[in-house]
Design a protein with these regions (language model features):
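Active-site groove signature of glycoside hydrolases
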Residues: 111-129
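Short, acidic/polar
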Residues: 29-42, 98-114, 158-164
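Alpha-helix-loop-beta-strand connector modules within alpha/beta enzyme cores
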Residues: 66-80, 138, 142, 146
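Active-site mouth loops of central-metabolism enzymes
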Residues: 20-32, 89-102
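Structural motif
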Residues: 41, 45, 113-114, 147, ...
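Beta/alpha (TIM)-barrel catalytic core signal, keyed to glycine-rich beta->alpha loops juxtaposed to Asp/Glu
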Residues: 127, 133-336
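N-terminal binding-site loop/beta-alpha segment at the start of enzyme catalytic domains
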Residues: 1-76
């Protein structure tokens, strides 16, 4: 696989988001043994940039990755997160906690579950509006000084927040949702208003061009959900999801919104047909085309999709392709 640079370390141009192996998507398809095998196969393919977080199965996902990396830890760049916790009612509404005490305690818990002595990339999952960013980020910087974390990142932040943190300790990565139906992080309008999990906690303000900020400041940008939570693959045509699948309560997957958003998929399919590729590969390749500093992390639990997603690294979109894709209409419905 082609590689991209993360803080001086080459990683596969396409990473692997591991959340769905433990949380949020189709619980009936979860299989820990199969997921362990898939993670190891990902490493064989050159997919070496792995992403997890404590809330993904309330620690289950981190433990799963720790199991998969036994004997192969040095082959992966491992990212996890702090700052969000699963509430007592185990609902989708994760609770923010950016206190220095929580930041440090959760790092120790993550190290234990992951079975490692150092975290390669430690994100602040969401900024806590009740805790100064400088306090959360300062505690994370102390973990770097202690040798427990190598690099720091932010998730779902604005340009102003990224700059504030960067002035205290270098920001190595910013992770935000970016796909053909969510382009806020690239400075496009829409999609953030009223969300509870966005960069500002639902103020309705846009984040600014975070992708460009990363390029200008030596950070990588990590798009999560580059496949639009599966929608951009062209395989989702109805809003019939399991109770354990959060897409069942996601505004963009309501029947009316879903049908309207199929206009986006039609363009993706047309580009894919020209290249003999799949819609998923085109959607991922579009994120890769946003800059050499961009490393998308599509998630999957299935081998065939792992191989399909990895193949996107070899798909070179033309200027005509990109113009058509950039011209798709904004998605109908809020992100959350």
């Amino acid at each position: 696989m082609r590689t991209r640079d993360f803080a001086g370390t080459p990683v596969g141009a396409v990473g692997l988001g591991c959340m769905g192996m433990s949380w949020a998507y189709t619980a009936s398809e979860r299989d820990d043994d199969a997921s362990v095998a898939l993670i190891r196969e990902a490493l064989d393919l050159g997919v070496t940039f792995l992403d997890t977080a404590q809330p993904y199965g309330d620690g289950h996902n981190e433990a799963l990755i720790g199991r998969a990396l036994k004997g192969r830890r040095d082959e992966a760049v491992l990212a996890t997160k702090t700052g969000l916790v699963v509430p007592e009612d185990a609902s989708w509404n994760l609770v923010r906690n950016g206190t220095p005490e929580h930041v440090k305690a959760s790092a120790e818990d993550s190290l234990r579950r992951l079975g490692t002595d150092v975290i390669d990339l430690y994100y602040l999952h969401r900024v806590d509006p009740d805790v100064p960013l400088a306090d959360s980020w300062g505690a994370m910087a102390e973990l770097v000084a202690e040798g427990k974390v190598r690099r720091l990142g932010l998730s779902e932040v604005s340009v102003a927040q990224a700059a504030e943190a960067h002035a205290i300790h270098p920001v190595a990565a910013v992770q935000s949702e970016l796909s053909l139906w969510t382009r806020d992080a690239a400075g496009a309008p829409g999609g953030m208003a009223g969300v509870s999990m966005g960069h500002t906690g639902g103020t309705g303000e846009g984040p600014g061009d975070v992708v460009a900020w990363c390029a200008e400041n030596g950070a990588v940008f990590v798009p999560y959900a580059p496949l639009g939570r599966g929608f951009l693959t062209g395989t989702i045509t109805s809003a019939d999801f399991e109770d354990t699948d959060f897409r069942g309560v996601n505004p963009r997957f309501r029947e009316d919104a879903l049908k309207a958003n199929l206009r986006i998929v039609d363009v993706v399919k047309a580009v894919a047909e020209r290249h003999g590729a799949t819609p998923a590969q085109v959607a991922i390749a579009w994120t890769l085309a946003q800059g050499e500093h961009v490393i998308p992390i599509p998630g999957t639990k299935k081998r065939r999709y792992l191989h399909e997603n990895a193949g996107a690294a070899d798909l070179d979109l033309t200027g005509t392709d990109l113009a058509e894709l950039d011209g798709v209409p904004a998605a109908v419905g809020d992100r959350y």
